């Protein structure tokens, strides 16, 4: 049906991305692009204009400095969204905990973007050329991000407030049993409020975020890739430039 066809096309696209001819490191224009989707209904409704104004648990995503807006009690943010007619699913959850007289805040965020039930058609065609749909199995392609946030007020006066914050983020990406990657990166942000004016700055991937990919194929899968003139991928590193 049409849905399975869409998933099959998605599978071919994903596998194509995983087939570098040799091991190397390179900057990708759209590396870890799932981290740019957004978080929270308010942030998305405002066109992502949250860096200066965010002051709840979702600040771990938009600008960790905004976590200092969470006072007295912990704050939780949850979000679920679906894309491409429900084929891709996006989940977001975050927690902010104020500590030390509301001057410091700890935060944790979890993001997941995934396409589930992708048909694996590597063994659809038998050696004799016949088609065997019983050989088609499903797999998932999922991207995860774990954000550990810290924010602190460095000035808290009636006419001027300044907060700073940072994220340490761990990336995990998995495509069935074929490929997986671990990555690490840092973000930093600042919020300044002076009377009725608010200014926010957010720097992502300030140390350059990397994903270290590893691949695992059975001998049968390698044979199919070889016979169909596809390269067998090996370990590589994907880099995300600061922005």
Regions found by a protein language model. Give the residues of each.
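Short glycine/serine/proline-enriched coil/turn segments at secondary-structure junctions
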Residues: 68-69, 84-87, 157-158
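Short strand-turn segments of transmembrane beta-barrel domains in outer membranes
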Residues: 48-51, 75-85
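Bacterial Sec-dependent N-terminal signal peptides
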Residues: 1-29
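N-terminal, post-signal-peptide region of Sec/Tat-exported proteins
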Residues: 53-76
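Outer-membrane beta-barrel porins/channels
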Residues: 26-43, 47, 51, 89-90, ...
């Amino acid at each position: 049906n049409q849905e399975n066809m869409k998933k099959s096309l998605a599978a071919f696209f994903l596998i194509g991305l995983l087939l570098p001819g040799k091991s190397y490191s390179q900057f990708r224009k759209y590396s870890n692009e799932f981290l740019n989707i957004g978080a929270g209904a308010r942030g998305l409704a405002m066109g992502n204009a949250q860096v200066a104004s965010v002051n709840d648990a979702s600040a771990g995503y938009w600008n960790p400095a905004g976590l200092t807006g969470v006072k007295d009690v912990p704050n939780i943010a949850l979000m679920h969204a679906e894309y491409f007619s429900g084929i891709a699913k996006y989940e977001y959850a975050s927690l902010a905990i104020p500590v030390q007289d509301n001057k410091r805040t700890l935060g944790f965020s979890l993001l997941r973007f995934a396409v589930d039930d992708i048909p694996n058609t590597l063994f659809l065609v038998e050696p004799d050329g016949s088609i065997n749909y019983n050989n088609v199995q499903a797999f998932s392609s999922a991207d995860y991000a774990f954000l550990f946030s810290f924010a602190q007020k460095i000035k808290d006066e009636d006419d001027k407030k300044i907060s700073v914050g940072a994220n340490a983020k761990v990336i995990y990406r998995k495509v069935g049993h074929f490929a997986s990657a671990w990555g690490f990166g840092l973000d930093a942000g600042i919020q300044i409020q002076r009377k009725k004016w608010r200014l926010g700055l957010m720097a992502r991937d300030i140390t350059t975020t990397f994903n270290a990919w590893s691949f695992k194929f059975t001998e049968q899968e390698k044979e199919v890739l070889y016979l169909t003139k596809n390269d067998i991928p090996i370990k590589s590193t994907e880099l995300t430039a600061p922005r």
